[in-house]
């Protein structure tokens, strides 16, 4: 979490940096490193005379690393790949005639929850002085759900529920390299590159469109698709500067080709019908 996640070109003998697996090659032989990241968030929201306080804790990552042999380091850990969490509502009133009894109030509640998690293990090796290479292999899994539930003030009108859920499980593979050179007694510059493999993901996506009376589903459609998601390939480069192990500066640039990845789309046709299908971004 330090330096806002910058680290493609940075390495340290006593600090974990899973932004580039090549950094594991510089682990200290006398250290076993263990790192946990947690975010605590407090929010105060107000609108008119109403106000609300929210408090939230979020797990960021857990990682450990140690030296296996001279010039060879190992790291493993668990970290969220993505997270979803929201809840909001909208309300509108329409008139179908004259008088208060003709007013129809529509309330829609939107919710989203879930996320993807990643467990990984990686190796970093230094074949030449100043040059190190590394690889992270991981497993990705998780579920995410987005829902919209619409209710009407007229009890004779059925509620509507539309829900989109997907489940993913697949592997991840990331490669990295670093080169460092001391240019003065206390100054070291470094260059790093990383590459994340893009590929299709195993899993499923489902779309539900239901009419609900009370707590019972009166009618509805369910459409399921399999193996529709893919990860884009990722390329990153970084520059680093280290002054006497007291001051570090880093600059990273990362490109993710989401335009070539696939996901799902709900398409409305000319006749008003809808199609849930695989789509390119």
Describe each region flagged by the PLM.
Residues 1-82:
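N-terminal, post-signal peptide beta-strand-biased segments of exported outer-membrane/organellar beta-barrel
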Residues 1, 67-281:
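Outer-membrane beta-barrel porins/channels
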């Amino acid at each position: 979490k330090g330096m806002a996640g910058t680290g493609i070109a940075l390495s340290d003998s006593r600090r974990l940096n899973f932004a580039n697996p090549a950094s594991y090659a510089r682990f200290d032989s006398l250290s076993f490193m263990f790192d946990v990241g947690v975010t605590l968030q407090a929010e105060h929201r107000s609108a008119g005379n109403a106000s609300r306080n929210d408090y939230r804790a979020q797990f960021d990552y857990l990682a450990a690393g140690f030296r296996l042999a001279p010039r060879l380091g190992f790291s493993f850990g668990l970290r969220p790949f993505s997270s979803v969490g929201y809840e909001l509502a909208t309300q509108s009133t329409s008139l179908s005639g004259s008088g208060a009894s003709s007013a129809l109030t529509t309330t829609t509640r939107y919710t989203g929850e879930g996320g993807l998690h990643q467990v990984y293990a990686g190796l970093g090796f230094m074949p030449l002085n100043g040059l190190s290479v590394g690889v992270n292999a991981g497993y990705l899994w998780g579920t995410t759900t987005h829902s919209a539930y619409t209710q009407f003030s007229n009890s004779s009108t059925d509620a509507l529920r539309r829900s989109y859920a997907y489940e993913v499980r697949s592997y991840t593979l990331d490669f990295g390299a670093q080169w460092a050179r001391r240019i003065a007694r206390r100054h070291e510059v470094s260059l790093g590159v990383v590459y994340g493999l893009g590929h299709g993901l195993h899993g499923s996506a489902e779309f539900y469109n239901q009419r609900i009376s009370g707590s019972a589903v009166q009618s509805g459609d369910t459409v399921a698709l399999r193996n529709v998601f893919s990860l884009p390939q990722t390329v990153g480069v970084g520059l680093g500067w280290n002054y006497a192990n007291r001051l570090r500066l880093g600059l990273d640039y990362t490109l993710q080709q989401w335009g070539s990845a696939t996901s799902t789309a709900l398409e409305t046709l000319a006749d008003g019908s809808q199609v849930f299908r695989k789509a390119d971004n």
